[in-house]
Amino acid sequence: MFYVKFDELITLKNKKISELNDNLYVAKKDQEKLGKLEKEYASTISVFLESTENNSKTLEKTITEAGLDPNELVKKSYGDTPRGGAFIPETDEKRNELTVQNKLQKLEALQNIVYSIPLVAPLDYYWVSSNYGRRKDPINGKYATHYGIDLVAQTSTIIMATAGGIVTATGKRANYGKMVEIDHGYGLKTRYGHLHKINKKKGEMVDFREEIGRLGSSGRVTGPHLHYEVLYDYKAQNPAKFINAGKNVFNNK
């Protein structure tokens, strides 16, 4: 028969209690560390989301100042993306993950949009001889709508693309003379008229501020200048608004 002395039982019990207390102490410390990590994580996520939101607001402000609707453009950037998948109940962790993902996705979309908007002037040094809107025609003296702005500089001054895109038209056109048209995506196009020389062909890709031609006096003009247009969804926009809005992003003239 196996016997255990009473004092040995007490010793064994005290040992187990001590081990249990040690384990509880370690568990408590681990819990404190976990709580601290969770707070640090929450703080980091909060700071990150605030920074992302501020950057998005800055870009939205620039787009709005150009006369465009940032929400409309963001929707265009997403397109008709197919959707589906299994239903997974939402948790706090998953909610945070989705919030971060959505904020980042929107910021990325806004950045791509701003890169595609013509926010600079097509030449470095110029003066404006005709603004956008109603004006007296310089040739026949009758009032009509001017769908762009006229930028005066010396003949053969370099003309640059005001945003990256693809050349959709080149050559001679009535009233424009020698012209270049660029599609920047999102429904945005720019036109450059009265050129002396065209350096690009239809279908070519162009980068931001890449030379596309030289200033001239071709077409219906009274002297050398660039007729510059911005279109959104085929409707003429005021190019000056885009250039002024771009001063928040670029060091414009």
Predicted feature locations:
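Catalytic cores of peptidoglycan-degrading enzymes
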Residues: Y115-K253
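Non-catalytic extracellular/periplasmic "stalk"
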Residues: M1-W127, N131
